[in-house]
């Protein structure tokens, strides 16, 4: 087994909730991260957007608060997802979510 763990904080830019055909509750948010980090002794601006998927009943209480503008910290694993048009992207599957605001 190899390690696949990511912790990322940021601001939700959009959110949607739905139930799968199997009846599993899902919340999908777009998380925008902005920070500054040192790399090779130089300060660098860091920016990314990543889709975050929260699946299952244990996220029901937090999911109702996940709206655009809310700051969160997410811990989970990343997985490659292929869209209907064949585009690949990394998606963060949440295992823990903390509201920051």
Curated annotation (Swiss-Prot):
Q: Name one GO molecular function term.
A: single-stranded DNA binding
Q: Is the Oxidoreductase keyword given for this protein? A: no
Q: Where are the transmembrane segments?
A: none
The residue ranges of the SSB domain are: 1-101
Output the Gene3D superfamilies linked to this UniProt entry: Nucleic acid-binding proteins
What PROSITE patterns does the record point to? SSB
Q: Which UniProt keywords apply?
A: DNA replication, DNA-binding, Primosome
Q: Name one Pfam family in it.
A: SSB_1
- Output the GO biological process annotations, alphabetical, semicolon-separated: DNA replication, synthesis of primer
Spell out the GO cellular component terms annotated for this protein, sorted alphabetically and separated by semicolons.
Answer: primosome complex
The entry sums up its family as follows: Belongs to the PriB family.
HAMAP family xrefs: PriB
**Role played:** Involved in the restart of stalled replication forks, which reloads the replicative helicase on sites other than the origin of replication; the PriA-PriB pathway is the major replication restart pathway. During primosome assembly it facilitates complex formation between PriA and DnaT on DNA; stabilizes PriA on DNA. Stimulates the DNA unwinding activity of PriA helicase.
UniProt subunit comment: Homodimer. Interacts with PriA and DnaT. Component of the replication restart primosome. Primosome assembly occurs via a 'hand-off' mechanism. PriA binds to replication forks, subsequently PriB then DnaT bind; DnaT then displaces ssDNA to generate the helicase loading substrate.
Q: What is this protein called?
A: Replication restart protein PriB
Q: What species does this protein belong to? A: Shewanella halifaxensis (strain HAW-EB4)
As recorded in Swiss-Prot or TrEMBL, the protein's gene is named: priB
